[in-house]
């Protein structure tokens, strides 16, 4: 006799003799057992059931990530497309370019032979202005004369070996913010001290003031007030006033959104950029440290920045676009992407599309002590020609 689960052979025979039907199989599973609950014995279904929520979670997470990245991917694609096309003929140097120089030129480290080498390097280029670091300013706006002891020597040496090239004093400081010490432009005494410092260093023989105060918030009225005062001073002495400018919002009001998360401004509104440009003789856009991951997107970004700046810079002001004459590799500046060839091509594309015949236009090279032979070659071959 076939063994029936839960019944011995003798019990089964006795049940038949009494006229009873023996059990024909295991009892039906109740709902708890079917679902594996309360001591159920369905391990395979248990595991399958546990896997389904995990798969759903991963799908939802992937979808959420895609939705979050979609605006960024769209923007990067637009920048890459902006890098396509051919620059117009003639979009090359207008002989109004500039070069940022380090502090070694005015503190005694550089010698006559260095000036001779610099003159040889700049021969046949479009560079007309040198922004030589002569500060920094103190947080109260003052400038110790001890920080530029060899300025007069350098100015005279440049005039001798590079006639026609102007030497401007590159002055800057960090602005107070995010709990850090720095210059407070809201203080009238500080602004007055900056003007006195400009007057003091112009007495040394510099032909202009190049101001770089960072990080400068978009719309800062105290900054505009300072520029007005400096412009009166430089004009009275037939000197130049130039500034290093933040990049312009690549998307409308992006500086406002960015400001919700940090007190360290990166962009200016296009309107504020124009307000600054109308107060100076030269405005140099720091069009590097963009965090762009590819040459194509970086070049497209520079093309966009060039167009945005051209739209609001008056024809009487020199507009210069910064070129990255240095190598770094970090989140803000990917060295493989932010190259001189990509920047020059971007500048030419933006110029071609917006104001190809603009005469008061150039590029500014940052910075002499970090530049490579490849940087100089790209500048000369792609921009100077």
Where are these regions (language model features)?
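Substrate-binding cleft of secreted/luminal carbohydrate-active enzymes
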Residues: 78, 288, 311-385
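Conserved, mostly hydrophobic/aromatic
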Residues: 130, 211, 283, 321, ...
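N-terminal Lys/Arg-rich, disordered targeting/topogenic segments
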Residues: 1-58
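Hydrophobic membrane-insertion alpha-helices, especially the h-region
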Residues: 60-78
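Flexible loop residues that form catalytic
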Residues: 135, 214, 288-289, 368
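Aromatic-capped interface at the extracytoplasmic side
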Residues: 77-91
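Extracellular glycoside hydrolase catalytic/binding regions
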Residues: 216-220, 239-310, 332-349
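Chitinase-like catalytic core of GlcNAc-active glycosidases
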Residues: 89-115, 121-124, 129, 133-277
């Amino acid at each position: 006799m076939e063994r029936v689960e839960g019944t011995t052979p003798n019990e089964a025979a006795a049940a038949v003799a009494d006229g009873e039907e023996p059990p024909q199989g295991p009892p039906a599973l109740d709902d708890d057992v079917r679902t594996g609950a309360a001591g159920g014995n369905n391990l395979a279904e248990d595991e399958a059931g546990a896997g389904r929520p995990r798969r759903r979670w991963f799908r939802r997470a992937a979808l959420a990530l895609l939705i979050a990245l979609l605006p960024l991917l769209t923007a990067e694609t637009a920048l890459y497309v902006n890098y396509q096309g051919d620059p117009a003929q003639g979009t090359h140097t207008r002989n109004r370019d500039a070069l940022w120089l380090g502090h070694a030129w005015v503190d005694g480290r550089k010698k006559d032979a260095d000036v001779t080498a610099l003159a040889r390097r700049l021969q046949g280029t479009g560079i007309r202005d040198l922004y030589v670091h002569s500060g920094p300013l103190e947080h109260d706006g003052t400038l110790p004369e001890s920080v530029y002891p060899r300025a007069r020597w350098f100015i005279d040496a440049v005039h001798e070996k590079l006639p026609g090239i102007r030497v401007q004093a590159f002055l800057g400081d960090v602005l107070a913010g995010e709990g850090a010490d720095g210059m407070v432009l809201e203080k009238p005494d500080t602004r007055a001290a900056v003007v006195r410092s400009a007057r003091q260093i112009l007495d040394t023989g510099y032909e202009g003031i190049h101001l770089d105060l960072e990080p400068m918030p978009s719309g800062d009225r105290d900054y505009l007030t300072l520029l007005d005062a400096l412009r009166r001073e430089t004009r009275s002495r037939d000197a130049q006033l130039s500034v290093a400018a933040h990049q312009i919002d690549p998307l409308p009001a992006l500086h406002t959104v960015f400001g919700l998360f940090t007190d360290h401004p990166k962009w200016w509104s296009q309107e504020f950029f124009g307000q600054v440009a109308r107060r100076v003789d030269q405005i140099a856009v720091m069009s590097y440290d963009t965090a762009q991951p590819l040459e194509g997107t970086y070049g497209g970004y520079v093309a966009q920045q060039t167009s945005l700046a051209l739209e609001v810079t008056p024809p009487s002001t020199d507009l210069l676009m910064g070129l990255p004459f240095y190598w770094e590799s970090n989140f803000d500046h990917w060295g493989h992407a932010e190259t001189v060839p990509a920047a020059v091509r971007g500048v030419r594309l933006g110029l071609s599309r917006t104001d190809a015949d603009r005469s008061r236009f150039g590029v500014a090279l940052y910075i002499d002590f970090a530049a490579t032979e490849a940087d100089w070659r790209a500048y000369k071959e792609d921009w100077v020609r």
